[in-house]
Amino acid sequence: MNKQSTQKLPHVTTRRLHDMKSEGEKISMLTAYDYTTARILDRAGVDVILVGDSASNVFAGHNTTLPITIDQMIYHARAVVRGVQAETSRAMVVIDMPFMSYQLSSEEALRNAGKIMKENECDAVKIEGGNVIVDTVKRITDVGIPVMGHLGLIPQSIYKFGSYKVRAREEQEAEELLRDAKLLEEAGAFALVLEKIPADLAAEVTASISIPTIGIGAGGACDGQVLVINDMLGLSTEFHPRFVRRYAELDRVIFDAVSRYVDDVRGGTFPGEDESY
């Protein structure tokens, strides 16, 4: 792909992701919360852009993902979708359903999933949890809304588990996770995020289901990988877990640029003749 091209390309669909799994082609996924970042990600060839409820952390500064609302998620999603449409329109856009937007009942979940899909032009929603949300996933997918599942470490349940440690190290929890993955596939989920679980378990799950797995801290055997954009760009200097590979150190780059700007303004060298009319 020409990284600088804005030529419209075939849009990534659920069928395309399934084909990528069957053909052994890895799936790339990153988060985005704004128009500008979404344009860059789509132009760079990212397959799936996740409008993550991690916006609660990295965009709004909360300690958890719980505070963000459905209307705030839709606000971010609209910006991301416009960014993708302004470039190649290739990337699939998936939106996290935030905390308490799907837990009350399947009907409430369907209503909120429909609201998300109707109020922007996204491609799918993502829901956290295992067997307790299987009926909800089926209810939503039965009306034609694609659902991506999420197993392992599920950040919306952080207060239940008490930490962000690796999940499913014990045999019982590993067996439950494998069973939940199969149940979610049967319920109609088109893909699963596997977060912070042992690599060998992720490999077993990936081999046991026909839908793609997207790993984050789950080893290299998953069908794809996802990271939070702020983490992989080095914008979150206080957060550097083992599973994150930093591809840039933008905190330092931005700090240096802003410092030079401040110095130029204070020193009277900006604006100069070239920046004046």
UniProtKB/Swiss-Prot annotation:
Keyword Lipoprotein part of the UniProt annotation: no
Q: Which compartments is it annotated to reside in?
A: Cytoplasm
**Names of required cofactors:** Mg(2+)
Positions annotated to bind Mg(2+):
53, 96, 128
An example GO biological process term is:
pantothenate biosynthetic process
Q: Which leading EC class covers this enzyme?
A: transferase
The molecular function terms of the Gene Ontology recorded here are: 3-methyl-2-oxobutanoate hydroxymethyltransferase activity; magnesium ion binding
Where mainly located? cytoplasm
Q: What S-S linkages are listed for this chain? A: none
Q: Which domain of life is it from?
A: Bacteria
**Keyword list, A-Z:** Cytoplasm, Magnesium, Metal-binding, Pantothenate biosynthesis, Transferase
The residues the record assigns to binding 3-methyl-2-oxobutanoate are: 53-54, 96, 126
Q: How is the cofactor bound?
A: Binds 1 Mg(2+) ion per subunit.
Residues of the active site are: 195 (proton acceptor)
Write down any Gene Ontology CC term. Answer: cytoplasm
Q: Cross-referenced Pfam families, in alphabetical order?
A: Pantoate_transf
UniProt keyword Magnesium present? yes
What InterPro entries does the annotation carry? Answer: Pantoate_hydroxy_MeTrfase, Pyrv/PenolPyrv_kinase-like_dom, Pyrv_kinase-like_dom_sf
Q: Subunit details for this protein?
A: Homodecamer; pentamer of dimers.
Q: Which family does it belong to?
A: Belongs to the PanB family.
Role description: Catalyzes the reversible reaction in which hydroxymethyl group from 5,10-methylenetetrahydrofolate is transferred onto alpha-ketoisovalerate to form ketopantoate.
| Name recorded for this polypeptide | 3-methyl-2-oxobutanoate hydroxymethyltransferase
Q: What gene is this protein translated from?
A: panB
